[in-house]
Amino acid sequence: MKDKIVRATAKDGMVRIIAGITTNLVNEGCKIHECTPVASAALGRMLTAGTLIGTTLKSEKEVVTLKINGNGEINGITVTAHSDASVKGFIGNPYVDRPLNEKGKLDVGGAIGTDGILYVIKDLGLRDPYIGQVPIQTGEIAEDFAYYFTASEQTPSAVSLGVLVDRDLSIKAAGGFIVQMMPGADELLADVITYRLEEIPPITTLISEGKTIEEILEYIFDGMDLKVLDSLTPEYKCDCSRERVEKALISIGKETLQEIYDDKKNEEIVCNFCNTKYEFTNDEIGELLNNSR
């Protein structure tokens, strides 16, 4: 099944919904970083959150960066997303291994850690980026984003993020949704939606059964005048390039660049997001040094 993000409303616009299937996207990201099952679940949830939140941006020049930095063994996850639903991610320790939690599930909360901060950084093309931050609540990621939307953006929200890892470490199913109540929405409506969300099977179960994202939303919002507004195709996409790496090398400063050049060795730079390797000969380092003067 192809990955897909949809934006929708229910109850005459009183409910805003962003939902998607992200199985292939998450599989690509976890394969790049060679993740263990619990690392795949954590990175996959962050990538899914990123692509969903990215679709709320107004223009292609805007960027949202999500960071969850807890005290667990994963050592933090950073995700960057754009309005076209493209996303890339970096995980501090993709090799973390933990026993299952008390529910028999992958212990994402333990791997992330509960002592830390969730950051949402939006670069909207203004002089300074918008930075929202909240304390990590559970480390399970979905609950942390729900708390962020309610506490930092004053928008009561339900967030579900799921990743099902297969025995061969590939991603069997991944997806999620963000459901937000708009100002003026009936409290009873919020209670009904909360009840339905608690009663449905995990989103990864529904995806594994072959249900489309539209069918999943129709199941949740039956009788609530669901309207799908548009759809996007999410993808794992890194925008690194040799030119950007050259600029990054120049930005480290002349003294450091001079030290690298004086070592008379070639330099290899590896992109944290896609593991692409960029090789620079000593002569090329010298050219960059001259250009920085």
From Swiss-Prot:
CDD domains: Hsp33 (cd00498). GO terms for cellular component: cytoplasm. Keywords: Chaperone, Cytoplasm, Disulfide bond, Redox-active center, Zinc. Disulfide bonds join C238-C240, C271-C274. It comes from the Bacteria. One of its GO terms (biological process) is protein refolding. It holds the Pfam family HSP33. It is found in: Cytoplasm. Under oxidizing conditions two disulfide bonds are formed involving the reactive cysteines. Under reducing conditions zinc is bound to the reactive cysteines and the protein is inactive. GO terms for molecular function: protein folding chaperone; unfolded protein binding. Coiled coil: none annotated. Its main location: cytoplasm. NCBIfam families: PRK00114.1. Redox regulated molecular chaperone. Protects both thermally unfolding and oxidatively damaged proteins from irreversible aggregation. Plays an important role in the bacterial defense system toward oxidative stress. Belongs to the HSP33 family. This is 33 kDa chaperonin. It comes from Clostridium beijerinckii (strain ATCC 51743 / NCIMB 8052). The lineage of its organism: Bacteria, Bacillati, Bacillota, Clostridia, Eubacteriales.
